[in-house]
């Protein structure tokens, strides 16, 4: 269980914000193919943000710890980022919190935004060694990185995939 909410204000708000919602994408999976819509959702978010693939500086992965879903997510991200995927710091919060189901993407976003604010790529709790089938750049330790753009992706039961690009204010 979990919950999270955001107050989204206009860009010209007098109060300082954590980040800009720069771009968004959403796609559905093809019948029976897990995470098949994730590539399109992430690609759409980057395009919608007006960014290039190379502008993605950090990834907050769905990373549920399920071998099939983790591999499918990683394959989608490999298809999008190619060989540069190993150079993009990534993390997942599922090892710390488990899955909060519908609240998980909002909680992921909060973690990603706090990391961006504090110039950190958060650690992936309970992660210890690289899976040969997954080329995400995960770490068991927090890493310092002053990053301006973070991609947060999610995959829901029933095949809904979403991705958001947040950019530092």
Locate each region found by the language model.
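Condensing-enzyme catalytic core mediating Claisen C-C bond formation in acyl metabolism
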Residues: 1-51, 57-58
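Conserved beta-strand-centric core segments of catalytic alpha/beta enzyme folds
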Residues: 1-13, 102-169
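Residue-level detector of conserved, well-ordered beta-strand and adjacent loop positions
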Residues: 8, 22, 78, 91, ...
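Acyl-CoA/ACP chain-elongation machinery
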Residues: 23-35, 60-71, 87-136
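Stable alpha-helical structural segments in soluble proteins, enriched in small hydrophobic residues
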Residues: 37, 41-50, 76, 80, ...
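Short acidic capping loops at alpha-helix termini that bridge into adjacent secondary structure
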Residues: 53-55, 85-87
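Local beta-strand N-terminus motif with an aromatic residue
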Residues: 55-56, 147
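Active-site-proximal gating segment of KS-fold condensing enzymes and close homologs
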Residues: 69-83
């Amino acid at each position: 269980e979990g919950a999270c909410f955001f107050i989204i204000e206009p860009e010209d708000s007098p109060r300082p914000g954590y980040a800009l919602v720069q771009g968004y994408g959403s796609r559905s999976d093809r019948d029976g193919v897990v995470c098949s819509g994730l590539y399109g959702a992430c690609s759409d978010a980057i395009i919608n943000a007006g960014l290039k693939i190379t502008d993605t500086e950090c990834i907050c992965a769905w990373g549920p710890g399920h071998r099939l879903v983790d591999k499918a997510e990683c394959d989608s991200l490999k298809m999008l980022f190619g060989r540069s995927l190993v150079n993009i710091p990534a993390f997942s919060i599922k090892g710390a919190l488990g899955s909060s189901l519908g609240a998980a993407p909002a909680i992921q976003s909060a973690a990603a935004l706090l990391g961006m604010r504090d110039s950190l790529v958060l650690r992936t709790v309970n992660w210890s060694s690289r899976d040969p089938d997954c080329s995400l750049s995960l770490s068991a330790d927090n890493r310092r990185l002053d990053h301006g753009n973070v991609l947060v992706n999610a995959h829901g039961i029933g095949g809904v995939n979403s991705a958001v690009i947040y950019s530092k204010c």
